[in-house]
Design a protein with these regions (language model features):
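Soluble, non-membrane globular domain cores that form compact, hydrophobic packing
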Residues: 53-331
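Intrinsic disorder/low-complexity segments
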Residues: 1-50
Length: 331
């Protein structure tokens, strides 16, 4: 009965047909329960309409970010819009990586000057942190002052600002039209507000020895395996509720990869630590720190610190790896 009342109350103000049905049945003494499917169907239909119009509004907001022209380049053709359902039509084989960062929408707009074409892609993510994460996967190039972070190289500008990742590409793959590309980037960046905030977990990566542009942020195993393949199994229990950062380090004669994973609670972190040690390092536990040779001349390490799990790979110095992990716990 409570479900029926809930459904009827929420729909009646919007559905005069529903009101007439209820009142007619009340007068005739008929059982009112058959109206429940009708009322709930109408409620679902209204909800779908709301979602549809929200999508239209978001798409129009994305389109408004694009200037009409930049230097000698002007908009050409209609902008193409993609969402979570049809992203595969544009990114055949690569859509999973974007969906792993809670991708929402993509608008693609071409600009032309004569026979030359520049393509602008604006990816909208659910959060600023995920937009940064997607940007962090490819930071190759020289730093430029656009958006919250940006790099440029070989006719490709990539920048992150707010909840957006923007890619601007000269399809000829050279630097002939760098001024137009940078001008487009600056105009689009100015239309995006507010600025974004990088993931807080990023600040836990030690600055000393960190290779510039090597830091990555992600949540899921599919991203980790693209950065550093561990296993086809999800040994570290990565999912949408976990956050992870990864970076490359040069520490004197030692280089290594550092991975930090933050879990929702200590029990989940402990389970992941134990599973990693047993299944990957293939060693028994004797505390919260383990270092094990995994291949000829290379060591992997793991350090459990409450909800955080620190992992190192590719080190060739067992003792230095232990000291490195020990210092991490003090952060």
């Amino acid at each position: 009965m409570s479900n029926f009342l809930e459904c009827k109350t929420s729909v009646l103000p919007l559905n005069r047909v529903g009101v007439e049905l209820v009142s007619t049945q009340s007068r005739t003494g008929l059982n009112s329960s058959p109206t429940l499917p009708i009322l709930c169907f109408n409620l679902v239909a209204i909800s779908l309409l709301v979602l549809f119009f929200q999508g239209v509004i978001m798409a129009n907001q994305l389109k408004s970010l694009f200037p009409q022209k930049a230097k000698d380049f002007e908009k050409s053709d209609q902008a193409k819009i993609f969402d979570r359902k049809n992203l595969y039509d544009y990114l055949d084989g690569g859509a999973e990586l974007y969906l792993a960062y809670d991708f929402q929408r993509l608008v693609v707009q071409d600009y032309k000057s004569g026979e030359t074409s520049i393509t602008v892609e604006v990816y909208s993510m659910e959060t600023s942190q995920d937009a940064f994460g997607l940007y962090s996967l490819d930071q190759e190039g020289e730093d430029v002052q656009i958006g919250d972070r940006a790099t440029y190289g070989s006719g490709l500008l990539k920048f992150w600002k707010g909840n957006y990742l923007v890619r601007i590409t000269d399809m000829s793959g050279n630097d002939r039209f760098i001024e137009a590309i940078l001008d487009l980037g600056k105009n689009i960046s100015q239309n995006i507000a507010p600025k974004g905030k990088p993931p807080e977990l990023l600040a836990k990566l030690p600055a000393d020895g960190l290779v510039p542009h090597s830091e990555r942020f992600f949540h899921k195993q599919i991203i980790l395996n693209n950065l550093y393949f561990l296993s086809t199994e999800n040994l570290l229990n990565l999912n949408e509720k976990t956050s992870a950062v990864m970076g490359d380090y040069l520490l004197g004669k030692m280089n290594l990869k550092l991975l930090l994973i933050s879990y929702p609670d200590t029990s989940i972190a402990k389970y992941a630590f134990e599973n990693f040690c047993n299944r990957y390092l293939k060693t028994s536990l004797s505390g919260n720190r383990v270092i094990q040779k995994v291949e000829e001349g290379k060591f992997a390490g793991a350090e459990l610190d409450k909800k955080n799990l620190w992992l190192t790979f590719e080190s060739r110095d067992e003792k230095a790896t232990g000291n490195f992990l020990r210092n991490l716990k003090k952060r």
